[in-house]
Amino acid sequence: METSYFSRPIPLRFIILVTLAIHGPLLALQLPLTNSYDANFHVFFASHYAHHWFDPWNPKWFAGFSQTTYPPLAHQWIALLSYVFGLHMSFLLVQLAAVLLIPISVYKFARIWVEERAASYASLFSVFAGAVAFLVYSAGQLPTTLSAPLYLLALPYFYDWSRSADGKALIKGVTLTLAAAAVHHVTLIFGSVLFAIPVLWLAIIDRGQRSAAAVVIRGIIMAGIAGVGVGIVLLPYWIAIIKHPIEQMPIPHASRSNLLLNITYLTNYFFVPYGVLVIALPFVLWYGSAVKRLRPLMLGFWITFIFGLGGTTPIPRLVFRRAVAS
């Protein structure tokens, strides 16, 4: 019987304390507000909700525009807290909540793939993930860092419902999915393909004596319910986009470049987000391919990895066409 400390799972409470110890001081220094690209954009949206909760029309930019063109939930949480803490502190509190949710969601998501000890290590490593640091302190992407953990928390319920028809799992999974969509729709759109499909595949593998067709049908049912719910929750957004479709020229962005041709872009969009995980990539591909239960996850990771390389390969341009034009 193994008694080594490292052979036991790391308590989730300890991981949350580590997260708080690392990101708490950095957020207290207001680094996202002073150094990132988009943090103050989200504060600006929240400011409008704080002063005009039921009027989405914001006259302060572009001779006026509707804030329904961006999912509102993160901004509305900031607006609510701002009545007590002020806008800037409220942004930092919501961002802290998002950062604390990340290791929790990684643990819950990892548990459907691996045993408790491995899941706890995945959760701990997520605290130090370069992608999290980049999104929070450089990009200022509060909605992405809040929507992603909400969606990861929904996926284990999707697995439980698809595999065993657990009604409580259906309700919890749909609720978390709607919350994730109300924070950031694009994260949900990509996540539904790159994460939900591998989870459904795993539910089929783990079905036991159940019918594979029944598992797929239940997965489709939950996806359908969530889809209708997202349509309702984001109805103002869909109306705004249909009424005023995006017709501007694509804005050049370094993430869509060939990363191999520019060391700065390669560092910013590959080495920083992946960090030391770059060293583990060969093992990830080998082990993910060798273990049957991990193959769906490995395939989802591989597709995500290719898209994350931007214009380094022609695949993103072939799939998304104008959306990834440089």
Language model segments and positions:
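Membrane-helix boundary/interfacial segments in multi-pass membrane proteins
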Residues: 62, 71, 133-146, 247-269, ...
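Hydrophobic, aromatic-rich transmembrane alpha-helices
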Residues: 229-232, 274-307
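Hydrophobic alpha-helical membrane-interfacial segments at the cytosolic entry of transmembrane helices
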Residues: 18, 210-237, 297-303
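Active-site lumenal/periplasmic loops and adjacent helix-entry segments of GT-C-fold
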Residues: 9-14, 21-152, 156-157, 179-186
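Perimembrane helix-loop-helix junctions
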Residues: 2-3, 190-227, 253-259
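Membrane-interfacial loop-to-transmembrane alpha-helix junctions, especially the N-terminal start
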Residues: 11-14, 118-121, 169-172, 218-223, ...
